[in-house]
Amino acid sequence: MVKIEILGTGCAKCKRLFANAEQAVKDLKITAELVKVEDLGEIVSRGVMLPPALFIDGEVRAEGRIPGVNEIKAMLTERKQ
């Protein structure tokens, strides 16, 4: 199962990124654990300087921007290969 983490302070951009990730998972019909990480200490300890950030299986895939649903789907599909 893939683990998708959205690191951010709960701002509107963070919520939009979470919704995009959720939609990508639904569209691909895959099982995933979606996690919101809002603890500032955890965010900084992971090296994120510009939230929101998208981590897939522990790897940062986007930072400081909101990838669209199709881009996230491509990231998830690429991961499976």
Model segments located where?
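Short helix-loop-beta junction
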Residues: 23-31
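Generic recognition of short, well-ordered alpha-helical segments
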Residues: 16-19, 49, 67
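Structural micro-motif
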Residues: 47-55
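Thiol-based oxidoreductase modules, predominantly thioredoxin-like and allied folds used
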Residues: 30-42
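Conserved beta-strand segments that form the floor/walls of ligand-binding pockets within enzyme
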Residues: 5, 55, 61
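Local sequence-structure signature of Cys/Sec-based thiol-disulfide redox active-site neighborhoods
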Residues: 1-23
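Non-catalytic, surface beta->alpha helical segment in thiol-disulfide oxidoreductase systems
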Residues: 58-81
